[in-house]
Structures are given as C-alpha cells and as structure tokens.
Amino acid sequence: MNLGITEVKKGMILKIDNELYSVVKTEFVNPGKGSAFIRTKLKNIVRDSSIERTFKAAEKLESVDLERRKMQYCYADGDQIIFMDVNDYEQIPVSKDYVEDILPFMKEETPVEVAFYNDKPIGVTPPNFAILEVTYAEDGLKGDTTGLALKRVTVETGGEVQVPIFIKQGDTVKIDLRDLSYVERVNK
C-alpha cells in the first residue's frame, strides 16, 4: 500500500529498497521556503541496524502489513530455533539470529510472537520478562554492601545474569528480556 509522507507513523513497517524497516521516529518539517519533508529514524527488521532518512513531500512510501502469529519456543536445532504455532501446532524453523541474545533465558513453551512477511519468518518478539530459578550462585562477600553490590548467577536455562548479592541458589528471579537485567526476586 502506497502512503504519502504525512501518513507515516511510528511503528509502521515500510519497504524501502527491497528491505523492511520499522519506523522508530518521525519528524514532519514544513519550512517557510521550499517543500515539506519528513525526517525518519528507521530500524532494519532483518539486520537490526538503524538508519536516518529524509523523504520529500512528493515521495510515496510502501507500507507493509506483517502477519503476526502467537507461537511457543520448542527447542534449538543447530542455527535454527523451532517454534510451534499455538493454533494449529505447526512447527516452524526460525533463524537463531532473531533470538540469539535471549535464547539462554528461554524455557520450553515460552510464548513469543513471530512476524511473517510473504510466509517467511522475519522477526521474533519474546515476552518482556522471564521468571527463572537460580541453579548456581556463589556466596556474596559479607560486609560488601556499599552501593549496589552484584554477582553473576546461572539460571535454570543456562543463562547468566548479574543480581544483588542476597540472591542464593534455589531463589527464583524475574529477568527483563529487553536488556537481560535482573528485576526482582520472586516468591514461590
């Protein structure tokens, strides 16, 4: 679907030079002299890189609708991750690149949203948080309470995260998957 520059909004998916970009930011500029234009910050969906681009008022942009499906993480198989569609139980391989950083924090059956373009998976949106049990934690040093004292622990899925020193093996912690940080200790 073709759009004029005034119709471009944050969150839209645009096809530019045969690549898909998510609109991160827009700024419409109407100078006193000359024609209007829009400054955009775009994120390449496949390569996860950002660019800034300016479009003139007369330009037309192609908007793309993605199909989004609710799926569950099943397992990793080499350089692919297998997800299962929760509606029809179809298993779909997706490149490990889309979840490589959060994979060590994903349990089986973790719900995700997979975006498809022309029936090809192009992105995975995990939940914001994971609740995981600590399987290995070294003891914190007594008296090391100045400031925010942290230590590295291993969780049940094999991932490592920095946590406050009071966290012990067997505790359950909430981890923010957006930046892989400790949020809080969870009572069972």
Swiss-Prot record:
Main location: cytoplasm
Protein keywords: Cytoplasm, Elongation factor, Protein biosynthesis
Coiled-coil features, chain-numbered ranges: none
Any one GO BP annotation for this protein: peptide biosynthetic process
Name used for this protein in its record: Elongation factor P
Signal peptide annotation: none
Gene Ontology terms, MF aspect: translation elongation factor activity
Functional summary from the UniProt entry: Involved in peptide bond synthesis. Stimulates efficient translation and peptide-bond synthesis on native or reconstituted 70S ribosomes in vitro. Probably functions indirectly by altering the affinity of the ribosome for aminoacyl-tRNA, thus increasing their reactivity as acceptors for peptidyl transferase.
Pathway(s) this gene product operates in, as recorded in its UniProt entry: Protein biosynthesis; polypeptide chain elongation
Location(s), subcellular: Cytoplasm
SUPFAM superfamilies, per the entry: Nucleic acid-binding proteins, Translation proteins SH3-like domain
A cellular component annotation (GO) from this entry: cytoplasm
Record-stated family: Belongs to the elongation factor P family.
InterPro entries associated with the record: Elong-fact-P_C, NA-bd_OB-fold, Rib_uL2_dom2, Transl_elong_fac_P/YeiP, Transl_elong_KOW-like, Transl_elong_P/YeiP_cen, Transl_elong_P/YeiP_CS, Transl_elongation_fac_P
